[in-house]
Amino acid sequence: MTTPSVVAFTKKGERLVGEAARRQAVTNPDRTISSVKRHMGTEWSVRIDGTDYKAQTISAMVLMQLKEDAEKFLGEPVTEAVITVPVYFNNIQRQATKDAGRIAGLNVKRIINEPTSAAMSYGLNHGEPQKVMVYDLGGDDFDERISQWLVRRFKEETGADLSRDFGAMQRVKDAAEQAKKELSASESAHITLPYLTQHRGEMLHMDLTLTRGQLQELIGDLIERTARPVRGALSDAGIAPAELGRVLLVGGSTRIPAVQEKERLLTEKEPSRNINPDECVAKGAAILGSTLEGNSLVAAGTGKSLLLLDMTPLSLSIETVGGVATRLIERNTTLPTRYSRVFTTAVPYQRSVDIHVLQGERPMARDNKTIGRFRLKGIKAAPAGVPQIEVSFDIDANGILKVSARDLDTGKQQSITITSNDSMS
């Protein structure tokens, strides 16, 4: 059983989470929030009844519901959690996720990348040494393409523009998601939405059929776009497709035949069929949670213990002279990790240095994401090039970054732990 990440506020002041919130979205679209994950670590907020809710708070409401459901099932309190995040989440988004857990009353023991969690779920049952690729694909963009097609076809047939009807659009989006699922197993999906909208005094109904071939035309370019990250992952790992032992498909959209065919062409491997793409990420997180409680993790059939080593998804750097992003930690570095490097001054007799912390792969600072800034004051006045400033990056197992700067001559030191609040102040 899964819980949709949807939160709704009824006009009576009641808060609904999960399937209950999703069911009433048609009649209450302005007070229903979904897909909040993409707003984590940003300034985004939504105002309901005079109260502003940030993404962390909405996410915490979902976590509270999961906590409550788990406690009912287990019959005991749940106080700790392992939370999975998309691999592309930056440091700010990870800290915001941890903040959401704290708001929900949970001690977040670890933040783990979703593909890593999926691989862990698979590895527990397959002890042989091998290289595994995780092909993790969400479905929101696919749903949007189907929704647009339905709106367009409906307008062609009736003249009514559904995009201006919030209630109708919610029903269309739900139908689009269901059609996508049906087309993973069937050649066509019949979309019937009675009493969808009124147009010129007439009640209109939707009755359309979408074929698998039409779906492939709608989403073909999106599937093609997965080629670049797949090839990039192989290149970063320094391996050829022939060296892969398995390819794991994660996310419900990987059930789409065209997606699986693209994966075969890119990796020259049949996808592994013995994991549930909807559940494997959560299972891996549960396994990690068990190990954090002191339980050993043994691969099936081998008796050998497994060790989980996650990686940082993006390079970390500071801005240096000329606006250059000077890297201290490369992407795909195993966590936890620490790295220090000594820098010097560019201006004679300057008494402070600004540390501008960046995340990304571009050579110039302006083209990367700023995740923090701080100033080290009180350095010894000396000609340019004489002071020795040691900058250290320390990333814990959750991917949370601490940056420090120390004048090796005076001992003056300043540090910052990058949090969502730091990034937005």
Per-range role (PLM):
Residues 119, 164, 168-171, 190-195, ...:
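Glycine/charge-rich, flexible interdomain linkers and switch-proximal surface loops
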Residues 122, 183-186, 292, 296:
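Long alpha-helical scaffolds in large eukaryotic adaptor/regulatory proteins
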Residues 171-198:
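Conserved ATP-utilizing enzyme core subdomain
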